Amino acid sequence: MIDLNSRVAIVTGAGGGLGRCYARLLAQRGARVVVNDLGGAAGAVAREIVEAGGKARDEACSVTNPVEVQEMVQRTLTEWGRVDILVNNAGILRDKSFGKMSVEDFRYVIDVHLMGAVHCTKAVWEPMREQQYGRIVMTTSSSGLYGNFGQSNYGTAKMALAGLMQTLAIEGAKYGIRVNCIAPTAATRMTQGILPEEQLSLLRPEFVAPGILALVAESAPTRTILCAGAGSFEVANITLTKGLHLAGDPPSPEELVARWAEVVDRDEEMIPEYGFAQSELELNKAGYIPTQRKGT
């Protein structure tokens, strides 16, 4: 059983939808929960948790304001002594095709989704390092992983969060900090009007929330993109094909085009453990042999 009795969690965008569901489930498993959202929604969810016998407090700060975020984390540390779990869930939509989208709408979505997660993660990073324990979840999306019409701003932010997760998982490993992404599909205020009603009835937030528990548990993985919806769970991977090496100085672009099928062939596809794995693969195919160090 996943027991979070000793843990303190912050959930952003928790005034409704997925965030509310996450906060309630974390509290049911014993975590003390900071419910973050704008307006009075956070207070209502915190009261629900307390009335059900859990421990919660609300914070109405904007994740786009780094000063307010830092103050939220500091109040949490003062009251509860630690922060173990951060679920970066806050988000908005400003959907339009790229040609019709204003730069302001593009930037605003980046500010909320990406920079909001950066501000919150930055605020908890040092406390988690000091306590040698942390669980951080970024909310990515299939719109970022694969693209979606009318969501260039949203997709950009969501793919960037996957990149942020990849690096922070590497940097946090030696401090006991595990960082993952969840890519949810759920019926929320953000998806109303986008998906048909008969689909929304199957995509309840409660069917995504178990994925959050898996990603914040003691046994949580790290550097994983967990997809979740309608009670189904999958993992998305960013992979690298074996590809090919072209002789020539420089290689011929015509030969590259002619042999394109070999470049995209997914046999022996790999999941790189870190960014330099790509250059290591390419140098190896080019016949590079590292210079032996003196004395070895």
Located regions from the model:
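Canonical Rossmann dinucleotide-binding motif of NAD(H)/NADP(H)-dependent dehydrogenases/reductases
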Residues: 3-34
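Residue(s) in the substrate-gating loop at a strand-loop-helix junction
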Residues: 141
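Active-site helix of classical SDR
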Residues: 121, 157
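The beta1-alpha1 cofactor-binding region of Rossmann-like NAD(H)/NADP(H)-dependent oxidoreductases
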Residues: 60-71, 103
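Substrate-binding pocket helix/loop in short-chain dehydrogenase/reductase
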Residues: 97-98, 102-110
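A glycine-rich helix->loop->beta "capping" turn
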Residues: 5, 52-55, 75-88, 94, ...
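C-terminal helical subdomain
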Residues: 181, 199-292
